[in-house]
Design a protein with these regions (language model features):
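Active-site loop immediately N-terminal to the catalytic Tyr-X3-Lys motif
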Residues: 23, 72-76
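Active-site helix of classical SDR
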Residues: 45, 81
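Active-site-adjacent segment of SDR/Rossmann-fold oxidoreductases
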Residues: 70, 91-101
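Residue(s) in the substrate-gating loop at a strand-loop-helix junction
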Residues: 65
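C-terminal helical subdomain
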Residues: 105-106, 121-158
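Substrate-binding pocket helix/loop in short-chain dehydrogenase/reductase
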Residues: 21-22, 26-31
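Conserved NAD(P)H cofactor-binding loop of Rossmann-fold oxidoreductase domains
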Residues: 13-18
């Protein structure tokens, strides 16, 4: 930032997962999920926003989770945090639209990452990280007059 004094692109890609149920939700676990899955993105975005405003073609790409669009009875705290992330993302997009700062969100389903280590899950059937990267690249390559608000990505057979 010192060298260039502006930023054209911010990608928020974060996540911590937990298994829990609504009927026995631990408040501390929920706070932890919100801190990681929501507040870290808010804090980073607020820190970088003055630099994004200096560019005439800025974008923020927030990578959330399909669990921000649905619910999972086995991952309540995670689902709550990702729903909150989506609400913040939608509000941010509408706020920054007038400043011509694009805010797009990607909501992937199961992605083949190390979080699936030792689970026995069929990782070849999951979304591959390269596919997410291609979607991000496509969003970046769009003209400054085109805004893709949301992209939902699902595995074919997981």
């Amino acid at each position: 930032l010192v060298t260039y004094n502006s930023v054209e692109l911010l990608i928020n890609n974060l996540g911590e997962y937990s298994n829990d149920q609504a009927s026995s939700l631990d408040e501390n676990k929920l706070v932890e999920m919100l801190e990681i899955n929501l507040f870290s993105a808010i804090n980073l975005t607020q820190s970088v926003l003055p630099y994004l405003r200096k560019s005439d073609a800025s974008s923020i790409i927030n990578i959330g989770s399909v669990m921000g669009l649905t619910a999972n009875k086995e991952a309540t705290a995670y689902s709550i945090s990702k729903h909150a992330f989506k609400a913040w993302n939608d509000s941010l997009r509408e706020e920054l639209r007038k400043e011509k700062i694009k805010v797009s969100s990607i909501y992937p389903g199961a992605v083949n990452t190390s979080s699936w280590d030792n689970t026995g899950a069929d990782r070849e059937a999951m979304i591959q990280t390269e596919d997410i990267a291609k979607v991000v690249g496509n969003l970046i390559d769009l003209s400054k007059t085109c805004l893709v608000e949301e992209v939902r990505i699902s595995p074919m057979n997981f």
